[in-house]
Every structure is written in structure tokens, then in C-alpha cells.
From Swiss-Prot:
GO terms for biological process: regulation of DNA-templated transcription. The keyword DNA damage does not apply. Transcription activator that binds to the DNA consensus sequence 5'-[ACG]CGCG[GTC]-3'. Regulates transcriptional activity in response to calcium signals. Binds calmodulin in a calcium-dependent manner. Involved together with CAMTA2 and CAMTA3 in the positive regulation of a general stress response. One of its GO terms (molecular function) is DNA binding. It comes from Arabidopsis thaliana (Mouse-ear cress). It comes from the Eukaryota. GO terms for cellular component: nucleus. The gene is CAMTA4. Belongs to the CAMTA family. The modification Phosphoserine is found at S935, S962. Residues 761-785 have a biased composition (Polar residues). Residues 328-338 have a biased composition (Gly residues). This is Calmodulin-binding transcription activator 4.
Amino acid sequence: MSSVAEDNSFTCDIATIFVAICRNPPANPSDSLFQYEISTLYQEAHSRWLKPPEVLFILQNHESLTLTNTAPQRPTSGSLLLFNKRVLKFFRKDGHQWRRKRDGRAIAEAHERLKVGNAEALNCYYAHGEQDPTFRRRIYWMLDPEYEHIVLVHYRDVSEREEGQQTGGQVYQFAPILSTQNVSYNQYIGDSSDIYQQSSTSPGVAEVNSNLEGSASSSEFGQALKMLKEQLSIGDEHVNSVDPHYIQPESLDSLQFLEYSDIDHLAQPTTVYQRPENNKLERCYGGNFGAQYSAKNDSNKLERCYGGYVGGAEYHSSNLMLVKNGSGPSGGTGGSGDQGSESWKDVLEACEASIPLNSEGSTPSSAKGLLAGLQEDSNWSYSNQVDQSTFLLPQDLGSFQLPASYSALVAPENNGEYCGMMEDGMKIGLPFEQEMRVTGAHNQKFTIQDISPDWGYANETTKVIIIGSFLCDPTESTWSCMFGNAQVPFEIIKEGVIRCEAPQCGPGKVNLCITSGDGLLCSEIREFEYREKPDTCCPKCSEPQTSDMSTSPNELILLVRFVQTLLSDRSSERKSNLESGNDKLLTKLKADDDQWRHVIGTIIDGSASSTSTVDWLLQELLKDKLDTWLSSRSCDEDYITCSLSKQEQGIIHMVAGLGFEWAFYPILAHGVNVDFRDIKGWSALHWAAQFGSEKMVAALIASGASAGAVTDPSRQDPNGKTAASIAASNGHKGLAGYLSEVALTNHLSSLTLEETENSKDTAQVQTEKTLNSISEQSPSGNEDQVSLKDTLAAVRNAAQAAARIQAAFRAHSFRKRKQREAALVACLQEYGMYCEDIEGISAMSKLTFGKGRNYNSAALSIQKNFRGYKDRKCFLELRQKVVKIQAHVRGYQIRKNYKVICWAVRILDKVVLRWRRKGVGLRGFRQDVESTEDSEDEDILKVFRKQKVDVAVNEAFSRVLSMSNSPEARQQYHRVLKRYCQTKAELGKTETLVGEDDDGLFDIADMEYDTLFSLP
């Protein structure tokens, strides 16, 4: 009994000392019971945040450390830097992108004053990465004015597990036990928080508050001592008098977990409990364990997650303890390896015996590996006996409950399913620690009301609409939607409605929630299901696409008769006699009864396809609608001018682009110009050339469309584009060659030619050379003979047209120059001067004569008074003297100014030209006489010919020449040429062909002196 009393009194003394230290902590770490190792702190800075006492110790001992004189550039995680703010002002410019305030200027740094003991000692500023929210920065300096210029900066990349533990709202921890040997300062001084520790010789409870206020009265201190004595008593009657679940919560920034390696062992076991109103026990061994307890028949359950999930195992607090081996005295029984191995076997057997009861006979395969890993990696073991430095699990947890949002995920009845899901290796399921972090958020910023759809196929992205309401300003941070552990951004469609895309994932159910940019939970958790996409779709979707003959002949016949009934309107037949000739033109193009019977017959015979039949019916419907539209806009008996507005005349461009040849002629009949241009200068021929409509191009050329028309200049095409260049850029080489040939021949026909025999011979020689080179390169196949013949004829026409156009411009320039020279020679022989000089003299004489009469008007008025001979003679003498005096005055003034000018020129010559530039100056200067002969390069017509005519002609001829090298282009040219001849015949404008074998081309060689010809 005496030994027990001594132990009891010794424990009370320890508690008294502990409370006294809490009331009056040391002023700085140098006065504490433990001195920190700087090298150890630098190593631990890579894996955890430093505690306020450790930071204070580094700042106070900065003189023995090296200060950084330059700002770092993108320091890595774990960097610990010391700065002097007075020397390096911009130490925050470290190259990283930090989250900024709403204005985007200043960095959004959170500020907090940290306590060492119960006194504020440090300033701390927190910053989060903009692109990587897990990368953090903390800046510390002391509140002491003497040391406030010394700054400690700590960079860390927080892992998901650590971030979840630190951002989960109120976090609870195991408090380390108090030892009588080698107690460090940071083991009993909290970081501006409360740490409660308990110690007893029996399964009792001890509680100590380390954050007692300095202004507490003596009565409070007495009550604390009284409670401490009761809790440290030996008897078991005081066990139930103390709250068995109490543990102090700590805030995010002040939470610091003590190292288990610094805890010494006591002779008696120790137990730590939580507060009942929180009903949650988390955090054991460095954050790798998550524990959950519930009471059933006075038994305790421990559900743990360490690289996996173990659920359903029942443990009794009377025979299960968590022991750390090797950290206390060697004489402890709990530290022996034999008993430790035996205890692991006992725990494994208990786990295997109890798991089937709670998981319906399924034993997790990771249980043995979990326990073996714990024993190998961490020196922690399970023992069946009471040993020193142990944590006992509580015996009475009947009131322990989980939050509603958490119980839905890890409730005891769902443990088996969740364990199986984790064992199957789900890619998107949340691990246990992440669930603890997500569900532990206390700041809800969004309320989910509905999710549509709430499922999607596993291997496809699904667009998901979430309806809810924001409980804060949506613009205050970046938001994301989390599907399991996959985080995707979303967009706010309108207030309370957001949209995102569910990522691809394996089949199964995952958690869906709204998170902020740093991964914090901001809403309740819903489920989203991923389903396997079935191989067979619905019957309608599985049907093959409609083939060319998918519609039955009976259905096609019914469709044809239905359209025929709609188009055979009796009222329109009654008004046919009132229609004009232009309206009857489109009516003639419509199908008659014979055509309808022919279409029905082809359907019955099976020779008509459904696609062609439907297209023909659509064309007939469009014909009827176009007839109605043109009739409504036609004027009564007035077809001289166009009856359509400028906007309505643009229909010709639509028709040309679509290739509706049947609609082209009725539109022309209503007065629309064939070369009508749109806002960009495009005509119908440009639109038809862009889409490669061969029939429409032939119809436009036959109707007189200009093949050389150029579009309006633009940034992309400063010189504009012709229809041939548009066709060539879209890959229609045959069409481009045909249009180029037509443009060249039309250009040649618009010129008035007076060719000589020499120019004709030159064009003929050039044409023969081109044709010979093409004939040598072209194949001699029979199927390509017809198209090759047409192509050679096109090249011949284009080559002769290009040569004759260029020769015509050269001849025109030559004639103009000769005419000018002949006129100059004629004038020089007759008058001794050129015509230009004569015209200038005559103009000056007129001006001089007029001015002279004005100047002599005063003299004439004077002469009227001196009509006598003597008076007139005196006047003339006086005037002569006055003129002489004026001449002398003017000469004197000119000579005076001339001297000044000569003086200035001499100064300029000597100072600038000779001395400064080291030249000869004006000595020996002779002005060059400008040549009056006009050079040929200054001829405006020649410049125009070089810039416009020659370039356009060469490009057109190159297109025709390149057409001959492609068989497809030759075939296309042959089709367009043949269609042109047919169109001309249909319009009654056929032209005389050269011979029966000729395919409608005129031979330019046979048109020697024609001043005007039109050749398409």
C-alpha cells in the first residue's frame, strides 16, 4: 500500500508541475527542457509543417544560420529559407503562381498569429498555388520588434492524405502520454490549441488541459487540481465520473501532430478517449489509419484503412492494446519480440474469426498483409496484456454516432460492399482517407437538388446537368465536379444550373459532389452510376441504314401519285390562259402526264431507284413553288425591266450554286441579268464554278455570261478572282481549262485587230510547238482519243488567242509611238519647232497680250490729255526715263540679293561639301541636260499590259495547258463542251460547225481579219 501511495503522490506532483508549466510557459525555446536540432528540422520540413516552437527556435537562432540574399526561383517542396526583409524586400517573388484576390493584383494570403504556449509569438501568412492547389507557402516572422525583420519561408507540396486531414474542418487527434523522463517542450505546449492527456495505473482516464488562461482565478486552479487528483486515483470508482470520450479539437493551421518517437513509456497503461458530442475518432500513426467505433453488446469495432480497407472486425478493449516497441526502456515486457509476434498472431486469429460475422462470410484478402505491414514498417504491435506506453480502446462507446453524410458511405452495414469494391481495384472509388476528408467538410457552399442523368455509359463521356443553389458568391473561387477521384470542371449555365461531362470510368457507382479549386467538399454527396453499354441497341437503332432500294415499289408508286395529285390543280389550269409567255416557260418545263406515267412504269419495272425517284419528285415540287413565287412578283405586261428587287435577284446565285438548270431560264426570263453580282462581286458563273456544276456553267456561257469577270478585290485576293481561278482552286481542272479558253477567245474577239503577216506567223509557230509537246506526252489509248482531240483543239485556240492578244497590244504601242514621232517631225519641218512648243508659245502670247493691255491702260488715259505732237513727245521721253529708272532699281535689288545668295552658296560649298564631306564641292559642276526623248518603259499602255494583260493571259493559258496532262480534266472538258453544244441547240442559237468531225470549236487560224467573233 505504501508503494501505491508513493506512486500516487508522485503522479500528482507531475500533474501539478504540468499545470504550472501550462500557466507560465517558457519565454522562448532556449529556456525549455529540450533543444531542437537544426539539421533535423530541415529534414523534417520536407514531410511536415514546422510547429510554432520549432519556427520560433529557428528565428531566434538565425545568427548561427545562413541567410538567403537573393530571391529564389521556383523553390521545390520542402525548401526552408531565411531572409532579411531589410536587405531583400521582394523575397515573395519566387517564380511560382499563387492564388490572387478578386482584383487579380495582390496575392490572397491568409494571416494568423500563432501562439507559443499561451502567448502570441509569430506572424504567419499562408499562400496557395494557383495552378497546383496542393503546393503551399508559409511565411513566419516574430512579433518581437527586434527580430521582425527575420523571415522564415517554408514551401510544401501537401499530399492528398495530409490535405484531407488538414482541411476537414474540426480534426481530432490522439494526445501523447506524459512521461517523467526526457519530456520535450513541444510535447506539452500546444500550438494555440488544447491537448488533453490522461494517465492512470488502471483502465481509468486522466485529463489535463494545457491551455488554461493566465487570468484564471485560484478557485479554478483548485478545481483543476481536485479533478486531477480524482482522475489519478487508483480506485476504479472514479472511472465513470470522467467523460470517457473527451478530446480537444484543433483548428486547421494550429494543428500539429506529435511524433510518437518522442514519447517515453510509463509503468502503467494509458488510455485516451474522445468527446461524446463529436462521436468521431480519427488519426492514428501518422494519418494512415481511420478508425470508427460503434457499440453493440458492449463490444468495440475498429475499422481501419492502411493501403486498403478492413471492416467488420470486433475487438475488445480488455485484451487489445496498441503498443510501440523499442521506444522505451528495454526492460518493458511489451517490447519483447516474442510476445510481440504472439500478439500479432492473436490479433490475426481474432480478425479472421470476427470478419465473417460482419461481411457475410467474405474475408478480405488484405487483412494479413495489412497486419504484417504494420508489424514490419512501424514497430507497432498488438498485445493481450497491459504494458507500458499503450493506448487502450474505450470500453463504453454506446453513444458514438457518425454524421449523416458520412454514415451513408462507411456505415457498418455497408462495410462488406465497400470492402469488396476496394478489393476489386475500382479506378474511381474514393479511398477511405479521401472519404474521411471529403465528408468531413463543414462549409457547404452548394446544395444539390437534382442530377440529370444520374447514370452514364462506362466508356463514354456523358453530359450531366446538376440543378441546385449556391450558398455563396459563385465567382469567389473556381469550382469543379468530382466523380469518384476524377475532378472535372463545369460551367454555370444560369443561376442554380451547372453542366459538366462525366469522365470515362469502369462500370459501378461512384460518389458525385461539388468541390472548390483546392479539392474541398462544398456540397452533399450523391451517387452516379456507370453502366456497361449493351451490344445490341434498340430495334429501330439496330436496323441498317436505308439502302438505295429500301423503299418498296408500292410505296414509291403511292408517293408519286400523291405528288401528282397535289401538282395537278384545276384552278391553275383555269388561269393558264391568263399567264404570260414568261410564266408559261416554267409551266412547259413541268412534267406532263406522259412523264408521270413513265416514272410509274420505271418503278414497276424495277429500273428506277428510290433515291432518283425522290429527287425527281422534289424537283417537281420546287418547280411548282418557283412558278408560284415568280408569278406573284411579275408585273402585268411589263417585262422590259426586271420585276425582282436586288435582294430577290440573288436567287440566280443560289440556283447556279445548286446546279438547278431548269430554274435558270425562267429567272432570266423575268429580267435578271446573267452577270448580276452579289455584295462580293460574285456572279452566277463564279458560284457555278466553285461547286463544279458542269451543266450550269454550259448554260451560263450559252446565255452570254462573261467568263473573264473578276470578283471584287479583298485582303486575300487583292486582284480579284476569275471563274476559272475559282474552279481551279476547288479541284475542277477541266472546268477551269474550259473557262480559261472561253475567256481568252472572248478577250480576243473584243479587240479590233490589224494584224500583220508576221504576227500571225509567230502565233502559228508558237501554237504548233505547244501542240507537238502535248502530243508527245499524251497516251495513245482509244478511249482517250476523243477527249484528247478536244483538249488539243482547246490548247490550239488558247495559244493562238494568247499570242494574238499580246501581239495586238505590242502593235498598238508601236503604232502610237510611230504616230507621235511622225507628228513631231512634221511640225519641226514646217515651223522649226515641235507642236508642243508651238502650243506653249501661243498660250503664253495670249496671256502676255492680255496683261500688256491692262498695264498700258494708265498710259492710254494720260495720252488722251496730250493729243498734240509736242505733248506726246514729252510724254514718251518722260516714260522712257521712268522705265530706265525702274530698270536700274530692279537691277540693283537683284544684284544685291544675288550677292547674298552667292555668299551663302560659297559657305555651303566650303563648309559642308568640301570640309565636312571631304568632296570636291561645286568646282567643275555642270548640270546634265535632261533628255527629251520618251522611253518605252514610261508608256502607260505598256505598263498596264505587263501588270494586267500579260499576267492574266499567261495564267489562263497555263490552266488550259495543265488540263491536257490530266485524263480526268480532259473528260470533264469534253462533257462541258458537249453540254454547251446541246444547250445552244436547245436555245436555237446553234452556230455553223467547221466540219462533221469538229466538236463545236472554231478554228482561230481560219479567222484572219475578223474584227469581232464570239467563240465560247
